[in-house]
Amino acid sequence: MSFSLKKKHKKGGRKPKLSVENILVMYLKYYRDYNTFFSLGNIFGINEANAYRWIKWCEEIISIAFKSMINEITNMTKINSMHEHLVDVTECSVQRSKNQEIQREYYSGKKKKHTIKIQIIMDEITKKIVGIAFDKGSVHDFKLFKNSTTNLNSSIAFLADNGYLGIQEIFSKSLTPKKKSKYNPLSDEDKEFNKLISNIRIAVEHVNCQLKTFRILSERYRSRLETFNLMATLICCFYNFCL
């Protein structure tokens, strides 16, 4: 980053007030606490516009540094067919659009608000995030899964919740909890099977909780929706990098 900063100012001009370290801290603080740019400017002694510029500059540099990892998890090229994978969807609140058509697309009936869905695929052995996909809040979890996994080998095994009923038709080795019906209650073996799947799947839900320690994901997203995917993908890269 220091090299990029020197290159940015190689033609001279006024030197930046912040060091590379402080710029990085400001960027991480923005993701972690989701301060306004005005608040960040006051904390670091710069104006609001410069706080915005430095965060966008830092985001661009980090996305270049993590380019290969970003490609791996967005294209799902590191999914190992010999391992089991856990899949889950979390929703992040976004601002309501003035356009009624867009409102309907992003409205989540489950959350009763406008959201973007993030699908996380985690390797059960390595605990790393190996796949990520996004869609509007109105899209069903299983539809998001089908749309994002069209290029994957059908021999891959996924563990999913009851929202993914029918996944075995696409990935035959996959498992979902058994459902009871009015005339077919669950046997003791079925209950033990469901408990086993839940105990394994809890790991991916813990990952979602860890990602949402970044308040930019847990609070309503205030920026343009076009920037959301890169931001969320970078946070997943941070998680993988720290393992």
Where are these regions (language model features)?
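Basic, low-complexity segments
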Residues: 1-17, 114, 184
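Short, well-ordered secondary-structure "scaffold" segments embedded in the functional core
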Residues: 18-20, 34-243
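Short alpha-helical "packing" element that flanks the helix-turn-helix/winged-helix DNA-binding module
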Residues: 23-27
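Short amphipathic helical patch at the helix-1/turn junction of helix-turn-helix
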Residues: 30-32
